[in-house]
Swiss-Prot record:
Heterodimer of LeuC and LeuD. Its EC number is 4.2.1.33. This is 3-isopropylmalate dehydratase small subunit. It catalyses: (2R,3S)-3-isopropylmalate = (2S)-2-isopropylmalate. GO terms for biological process: L-leucine biosynthetic process. GO terms for cellular component: 3-isopropylmalate dehydratase complex. Pathway: Amino-acid biosynthesis; L-leucine biosynthesis; L-leucine from 3-methyl-2-oxobutanoate: step 2/4. One of its GO terms (molecular function) is 3-isopropylmalate dehydratase activity. It comes from Neisseria meningitidis serogroup A / serotype 4A (strain DSM 15465 / Z2491). PANTHER family: 3-ISOPROPYLMALATE DEHYDRATASE SMALL SUBUNIT, 3-ISOPROPYLMALATE DEHYDRATASE SMALL SUBUNIT 2-RELATED-RELATED. Catalyzes the isomerization between 2-isopropylmalate and 3-isopropylmalate, via the formation of 2-isopropylmaleate. The keyword Translocase does not apply. It is an enzyme of class 4 (lyase).
Length: 213
């Protein structure tokens, strides 16, 4: 998992509430369990004018010019700004995979669906909760200023605007530690590999019958 420390990046606005996981990555693209390759189909039904299916050459599909993420000013964005209850609907880890593969490192919203929120942390994507008033202000600034960038410092738990205004956000110490060090659940477990091996060897000596056969 990629570590997250700090970034300064273009912000892309998605001015919709209740964006569900099927909108983030439609169900027909869920056949793979690899974490990569989903970016070209993120927001597929809004992003393209035709219906997408696995195996299609996305470079030849007609883009929807009215979809915000298709606008030239938001190309290369690494921060997604959106509205409340982002990531609702069915549980699919493919949703944060798709956002990560698209290039996003963080998502800012007033609220997130619980399962999606937890899945973001497991996949190196930082979900930031701000108040609706703060999100409204950011939407106005993003839309009024082309090339608008925000700076996110995870260690300090701050988000800074181009004018120098700073917002703080909450995150548990455990989740912050994992993101700062690029540790998913497997990586976190492997940090304790020596202790695990020592425990298993001690148990092998004290309870050898468990290991016979």
């Amino acid at each position: 998992m990629k570590a997250f420390t700090k970034i300064t990046a273009i912000v892309a606005p998605l001015d919709r509430s209740n964006v569900d996981t099927d909108a983030i990555i439609p169900k027909q693209f869920l056949k793979s369990i690899k974490r990569s390759g989903f970016g070209p189909n993120a927001f597929d039904e809004w992003r393209y004018l035709d219906h997408g299916e696995p195996g299609m050459d996305n470079s030849k599909r007609p883009l929807n010019p009215d979809f915000s993420l298709n606008q030239p000013r938001y190309q290369g964005a690494q921060i997604l700004l959106t509205r409340k209850n982002f990531g609702c609907g069915s549980s699919r880890e493919h949703a944060p995979w798709a956002l990560d593969d698209y290039g996003f490192r963080a998502v800012i919203a007033p609220s997130f669906a619980d399962i999606f929120f937890n899945n973001c942390y497991k996949n190196g994507l930082l979900p930031i909760v701000l108040t609706e008033e703060q999100v409204d202000r950011l939407f106005k600034e993003v839309e009024a200023n082309e090339g608008y960038r925000l700076s996110i410092d995870l260690a300090e738990q701050t988000l800074t605007t181009p004018s120098g205004e700073t917002f703080t956000f909450d995150i548990t110490e455990h989740r912050k530690h994992c993101l700062l060090n690029g540790l998913d659940e497997i990586g976190l477990t492997l940090q304790h590999a020596d202790e695990i091996h020592a425990f298993e060897e001690k148990r092998r000596q004290s309870q050898p019958w468990l290991f016979n056969g």
